[in-house]
Amino acid sequence: MTTMTSPATLPPGPTAPRAVQGAYALTQPLRGMRRLKDRYGDAFTVNVPIFGNAVVISSPAEIKQLFTSGPELVDNLEVNLGRVLGPRSMFALSGDEHKRQRKLLVPPFHGRRLAAYEKIVEEETARELASWPENRAFATLPSMMRITLNAILRAVFGAEGAEFAELRELLPPFVTLGSRLAVLPISKKGRFSPWRRFERMRREYDAIVDRLIAKARAEEKDDVLSMMLQTRYDDGSGLSREEISDQLLTLLTAGHETTATTLAWAVERLRRHPALLAELEEGDGKLLDATILEVQRTRPVIDLTARQVKQDGFRLGRWTLPKGYAVLVSIALIHDDDTVFPHAATFDPHRFEGARPDLYQWIPFGGGTRRCIGAAFATMEMTVVLRTLLRDFTLVPTSEPGERWHSRGVAYAPAKGGRAVVRRRTTIGGAS
């Protein structure tokens, strides 16, 4: 029996060799995407390192179709992020295995447990903000990195200890290197390959986690690691050591850098919108929620979410894609689309007041069955940090041009680190 498949019908795109397209993508990532959309429309075909042959889409209808298609049609795109975080990471798993793991990992980051983590975030924010200088410019991104790293470490491992301190020192350079390796086609071969250094750091991380697992088995605690050790699959089996180690690394990296970067962008945006800043200083919680949504829309720190076609003749809107092709959803392109978000270039949080965003249009956390499991935790973190910052400090507005986008590997950060000038409203103890 012969299975008939529809012939491929692909959107137009550049015809330059892969190396040339790759160089363009690396040197002009966001601007290049916009130019390609202007030339070819809201879907175009590219051939670039890491992804290979790929169709880039930014139409809400096609994005919705992609996100709601089953894993037999489109599933995980196995790129470097899985190599960086490990073969048992959520980023490396597909199909039923991904579904099984996701079911176990979602509960620690929702519901009543989220409320318990809020106190941790507030404590870490107050601790970091106590050292902020007044009346002189400084980059806020390093502070936001420390807040989010310490908060996720405490949520995952509980109380501080020797291992906590070791991870706090190891993870920042580990995450920075891994983030760059995830987007660069660098071979693992060779004495001087940066993968050698990364693998050495990974062994250090695994040794620390092994000690933490041994301690957690001997103690009754209420942190994420303890929950992972207690949780069971439907067949009664538990998570393996490798699964725990890879998933913890995923939580620690994904739950730290991207949130911190969004917070730095929030500071950068607020200082350039004094009228909005004045409204927020009155303590309007709903406007703060809308502001966080708008920061994520206008300054998404991750530009792409991806799938791979698993079946020949996959119909995606107007197109028919062959098996093996990647489908790349450009978050920046749909967020910048005036037909989706009127006056998209304008930073206006009021567009989200009293309205929940459409999750096939506003997609900073990705979408579908692979949407970030830590989205609720990240949103809570951003809310607590900004609420505390605006309560305890006056952010001094600026007329300087907006900071440029700077690639840190996976994430796009403000080029100057989200510079701020602040004045303290209260003393450390909270007295006027």
Q: What label would you give each PLM region?
A:
Residues 221-222, 227, 279-285, 298-318, ...:
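Cytochrome P450 fold signature focused on the C-terminal beta-domain
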Residues 6, 10, 37-38, 125, ...:
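Cytochrome P450 proximal C-terminal region
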Residues 72, 329-355:
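Conserved cytochrome P450 K-helix/beta-meander segment immediately N-terminal to the heme-binding cysteine loop
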Residues 256-281, 376-391:
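Cytochrome P450 catalytic-core helices
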Residues 2-10, 74-82, 97, 113-261:
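Cytochrome P450 heme-thiolate monooxygenase catalytic core
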Residues 22-41, 284-317, 338:
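Conserved cytochrome P450 K-helix E-x-x-R motif and the immediately C-terminal K′/meander segment
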Residues 2-94, 100, 115, 119-127, ...:
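N-terminal membrane-proximal hinge/A-helix region immediately C-terminal to the signal-anchor transmembrane segment
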